[in-house]
């Protein structure tokens, strides 16, 4: 069984020391789903939302969030991300927007939290921009899809 890397031998929260690790290319992909009414989704897709381009705003918010993950999650390292991508795809038959984020760097620690934060904040931005027209929007299935690089190896969600 694995141990918690962020807890020291006294049981206290602790930032992991990565100074002895080798640099490698690390990449992570995450997703979030945002479910809403057909009318709200159509308003977003057609560009008729009174607040502007929901997808563009959510994309930028996700990218900004990935870059600030270390500032939001206390034990995350500040990272020099070399790539952040956020894509938003309407899934009309399910009244959803599927958000997928990708983060990449060459470094000593992984980028899973950055990818998860990007997808989460993009989803929250959609909610924020659309809450005036629909309050019961659901954000769900925020999850890591894939990670590679580093000593823990390659992970792909089932």
UniProtKB/Swiss-Prot annotation:
Give the positions the UniProt entry annotates as the active site: 128
Entry EC number(s) = 4.6.1.17
| Coiled-coil boundaries | none
Q: Which domain of life is it from?
A: Bacteria
Give the metabolic or biological pathway. Cofactor biosynthesis; molybdopterin biosynthesis
Q: Name one GO biological process term.
A: Mo-molybdopterin cofactor biosynthetic process
**Annotated binding of substrate, by residue:** 75-77, 113-114
Q: Which InterPro entries match?
A: MoaC, MoaC_bact/euk, MoaC_sf, MoCo_biosynth_MoaA/MoaC, Mopterin_CF_biosynth-C_dom
Which Gene3D superfamilies does the record match to this protein? Molybdopterin cofactor biosynthesis C (MoaC) domain
Recorded catalytic reaction(s): these are:
(8S)-3',8-cyclo-7,8-dihydroguanosine 5'-triphosphate = cyclic pyranopterin phosphate + diphosphate
Protein keywords: Lyase, Molybdenum cofactor biosynthesis
Pfam families, A to Z:
MoaC
Molecular-function annotations in GO: cyclic pyranopterin monophosphate synthase activity
**Reported function:** Catalyzes the conversion of (8S)-3',8-cyclo-7,8-dihydroguanosine 5'-triphosphate to cyclic pyranopterin monophosphate (cPMP).
Q: What family does this chain come from, according to its entry?
A: Belongs to the MoaC family.
Cite the record's note on assembly: Homohexamer; trimer of dimers.
- Protein's recorded name: Cyclic pyranopterin monophosphate synthase
Q: Which organism is it from?
A: Pasteurella multocida (strain Pm70)
């Amino acid at each position: 069984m694995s141990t918690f890397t962020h807890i020291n031998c006294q049981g206290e929260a602790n930032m992991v020391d990565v100074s002895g690790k080798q640099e490698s290319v690390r990449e992570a992909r995450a997703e979030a789903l945002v479910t809403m009414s057909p009318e709200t989704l159509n308003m977003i897709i057609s560009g008729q939302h009174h607040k502007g381009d929901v997808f563009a705003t959510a994309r930028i918010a996700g990218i900004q969030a990935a870059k600030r993950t270390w500032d939001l999650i206390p034990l995350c390292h500040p990272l020099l991300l070399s790539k952040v991508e956020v894509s938003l795809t309407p899934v009309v038959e399910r009244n959803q927007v599927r958000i997928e984020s990708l983060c990449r760097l060459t470094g000593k620690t992984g980028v899973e939290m950055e990818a998860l934060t990007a997808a989460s904040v993009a989803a929250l931005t959609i909610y924020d921009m659309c809450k005036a027209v629909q309050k019961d929007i659901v954000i769900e299935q925020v999850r890591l899809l894939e990670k590679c690089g580093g000593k823990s190896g390659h992970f792909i969600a089932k």
